[in-house]
Every structure is written in C-alpha cells, then in structure tokens.
C-alpha cells in the first residue's frame, strides 16, 4: 500500500491488526521504514526508526515523535480490523500516532514549504518508559542535532481535534515501590509467638495513606497507591513475609523525593515497633514531563492558525517517557481530542478503545504546519 493521505486510515488499521509489544516492534518498524523510503527520506535504524527530511539551507532542526508499541490487552472490539495477535492490542492509540506522523512526512516531502530539517522519530516501548531513553542512549539528539522536540497523544472523551497543552508540567512522574516485610511465621492459633507479617503489612498500608494530605498537600497532584499485597500464608499458617507493591505519581521532583523519604521513614518506624526488618525499593520510571515556553508557544500559534479549539489544561495524572527528551532539549507535549462517542471515547488502555480515524488528517496537517 502506498503512503497517501487517502490511505492513512487503512495504514492505521493495518498497524492495529498487527500490534507489537515494546522492543518487539519488528513488523511495525519494517512498515514504517518502507513508507519513509518511499517518500525519499533518509532512514536510520536502531531501537526505533528515524526518518530525516531536509529543505533549504536553514540550520533549524526539530524532532517530531510518535510511539509504536502496543499493550498486553485482549481486544474486545468487533470491527473488522481487530488485533490478530492474541493478548496484544493498540489500546492507547499508538497506531494512530504513527499514521499521523507518516501523513505529515508525506505532506512535507511532497510540498517542502519549510526551511531546515525535520526528524521523524518513531519510538519503541513508551508504555514501560524505556524507549525514549534507549533512543537517547543511541545518540538520537546528538546525532541529528535536534534543537526542539514535539510529542503528541490522543485523549478520549474530548471533542475530536481539540488541542490541550500548557507550559510547565504537563504529565506526572511515575515511580514504583516495593516494601518487603520480614516477619516471623507461625501457627494461626498462636500468633503471639511470631511476628504477623499480614497485620504489619496492613499497618504499613494505612500509614502510607497519610503521606498525601498529612505530609504533602492533597492539592499537589501527588498520588500514592498500594496496588499489590502478597503473602505466602495458608488458612492456618501466618506468613513469615509480606510484600507490598505500589505506584507513586507526582508533578514536582521535590514531592517525589519527599515521598521516597517518607516511605522509608514509615517502614523504619514500623519495623522498629515490631522488632523486625522491612526493606524498601523505590525506582522512578517516568520523570515529570515539562513543556518549555518557546515550543509550547509554537504549538499554540499553529493551533490558532489551523483553527483548532485550544484548551489550557491542568497537568495530567498519567506519565510519558517523552519527558526524557524534553528534559534534554526544549520540547512540548500536547494532546488532541479523540472524540466523545462510541469506542473513541473509551478510556485509554481499555479493551474496547479505538483510535478515531477522523483525527488522522487533523493530526497530520497539524504536524506539517508545525514544521
């Protein structure tokens, strides 16, 4: 299939039929590379795919990024292009992000009304927060001399094509924690002879709920959630160990550092009270995504010229590894409404979500105008 504006929907649906998980995007990368070569772009292979388009003698270099990976979700949609890879699905719209960026590459390569260099970045493994860093480790920004970078994401429940962005924090960071409680197991009829790791675990869970509201302001956007409570007990056996796992979101690096400190303080205090050991593991996977003033102004100005409705949104609670790029060079991450009806309005990461094909020409034209 040739890459033409009228074919973008079918190209998007082809990506949808054959979704691939992070760092496994083999077919996806081959398809993208083929389309970019068809347009005459310089194509570079690595953990992702990069296409380079030059026009005129200007030194300006901008990067436009789309993510490629799918999610380990079993699709429940009934349309004729549902996933053929069982248990894997494009439930976050990355199929549409790729198609929009390919559409922009077509428009700019056939009508090069810009001066400078556009670097089309197709990134793997956004969902686990590993792809952007992997491309940076390969030298993406230095090798292509990228001066500004832009990222896009669809947002269900918002009218089709409505643009949302803001200067400053746009997406929260995400950190994961694991708390290992080393109690003393024993018989359920004689709990006083052991150190009940379940009761102690419950105490830790309760204490963690006081971090936001009692240590960090409830309006800060910080969230601490315990998502797993794991023990090896039986009906008449008190477990000797309990593991708690959870998720932390913050909009400020200082809050993230404070929460890590408070997690350790709570664990240490409860461990001391019960004369046991508690180990805490804390790792940040996604940094806070920060939009810089100049590129954000460029996005807003382009939106006005394109006739798009603009919403100055609040920071989002979800996370994006685009943060690795925008922490290194000036950048802007923005969202386009995916629609308010049917599967287009279903939440991201749900089994009945679908990207809105009506957004493809809007996003493609916007990318091209931004360049």
Language model features with spans:
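Acidic/His- and Gly-rich active-site-bordering loop/insert found
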Residues: 1-90, 99-102, 106-114
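Conserved beta-strand termini and adjacent loop/short-helix elements that scaffold enzyme active sites
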Residues: 44-48, 123, 281-283, 313
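Non-cysteine beta-strand/loop elements that form the S-adenosyl-L-methionine
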Residues: 63-65, 74, 177-179, 333-339
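Residues that form or flank phosphate/diphosphate-binding pockets in enzymes
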Residues: 23, 59, 99, 130-131, ...
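Histidine/acidic-residue-rich, glycine-tolerant segments that coordinate divalent metal ions
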Residues: 49, 71-73, 79-89, 95-96, ...
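Divalent metal-coordination and catalytic microenvironments
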Residues: 15, 64, 94, 120, ...
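Metal-dependent amide/peptide-bond hydrolase catalytic core
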Residues: 38, 202-371
């Amino acid at each position: 299939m040739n890459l033409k504006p009228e074919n973008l929907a079918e190209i998007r649906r082809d990506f949808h039929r054959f979704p691939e998980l992070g760092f496994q995007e083999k077919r996806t990368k081959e398809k993208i590379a083929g389309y970019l070569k068809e347009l005459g772009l310089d194509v570079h292979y690595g953990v992702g795919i990069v296409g380079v388009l030059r026009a005129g003698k200007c030194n300006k270099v901008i990067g436009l990024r789309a993510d490629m990976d799918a999610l380990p979700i079993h699709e429940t949609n009934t349309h004729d292009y549902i996933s053929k890879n069982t248990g894997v699905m494009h439930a976050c719209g990355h199929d549409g992000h790729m198609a929009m960026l390919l559409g922009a590459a077509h428009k700019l390569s056939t009508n090069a009304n810009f001066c400078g260099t556009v670097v089309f970045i197709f990134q793997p493994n956004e969902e686990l927060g590993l792809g952007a860093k992997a491309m940076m480790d390969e030298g993406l920004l230095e090798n292509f001399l990228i001066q500004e970078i832009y990222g896009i994401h669809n947002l269900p429940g918002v009218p089709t094509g409505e643009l949302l962005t803001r200067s400053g924090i746009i997406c929260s960071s995400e950190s994961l924690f694991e708390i290992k409680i080393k109690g003393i197991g024993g018989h359920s009829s004689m709990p006083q002879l052991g150190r009940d790791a379940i009761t102690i675990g419950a105490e830790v869970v309760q204490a963690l709920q006081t971090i936001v509201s009692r240590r960090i302001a409830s309006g800060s956007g910080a969230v601490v959630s315990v998502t797993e409570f794991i023990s090896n007990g039986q009906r008449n056996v008190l477990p000797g160990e309990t593991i708690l796992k959870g998720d932390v979101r913050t909009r400020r690096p200082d809050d993230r550092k404070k929460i890590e400190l408070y997690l350790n303080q709570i664990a240490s205090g409860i461990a001391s009270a019960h004369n046991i050991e508690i180990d805490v593991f804390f790792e940040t996977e996604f940094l806070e995504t920060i939009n810089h003033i100049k590129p954000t102004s460029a996005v807003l100005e382009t939106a006005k010229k394109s006739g798009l409705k603009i919403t100055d949104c609040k920071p989002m609670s979800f996370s994006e590894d685009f943060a690795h790029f925008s922490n290194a060079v000036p950048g802007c991450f923005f969202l386009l409404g995916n629609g308010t009806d049917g599967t287009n309005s279903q939440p991201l990461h749900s089994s009945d979500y679908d990207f809105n094909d009506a957004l493809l020409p809007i996003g493609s034209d916007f990318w091209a105008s931004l360049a």
